[in-house]
Amino acid sequence: MGYKVGNTRVAGDYTHHGKVDGTKIQGLGASVLYDFDTNSKVQPYVGARVATNQFKYTNRAEQKFKSSSDIKLGYGVVAGAKYKLDGNWYANGGVEYNRLGNFDSTKVNNYGAKVGVGYGF
């Protein structure tokens, strides 16, 4: 969900990053994206993201049958392109990198690629 002014978009999101070894990671974020005007159906974009990420873990070896959670500040970058279809519809493809925070002295990163279809109001 977001808002667009000129070539700049601002969006909020919820992301479930997954679960690994009893640790579930999810986040609430905000992104600022810039759309390059190419005067064609293809519109490249770049952006940055900040998020608060919750690391929720259960049944850790040193604390059997206990659960806890930590909140970490994260950041990321995104790049991609939109392809104008019909009317307000568009196809979208992009890549992203998110630094989710440190967990037990380990840097936790998320890389991804996305494709989708959108509708602009």
Swiss-Prot record:
A single cellular component GO annotation: cell outer membrane
Source domain of life: Bacteria
Signal peptide limits: none
Pfam family name, one: Opacity
GO molecular function, a single term: porin activity
Family classification: Belongs to the opacity porin family.
The protein, known as: Protein opa
Annotated source species: Haemophilus influenzae (strain ATCC 51907 / DSM 11121 / KW20 / Rd)
Lineage: Bacteria, Pseudomonadati, Pseudomonadota, Gammaproteobacteria, Pasteurellales
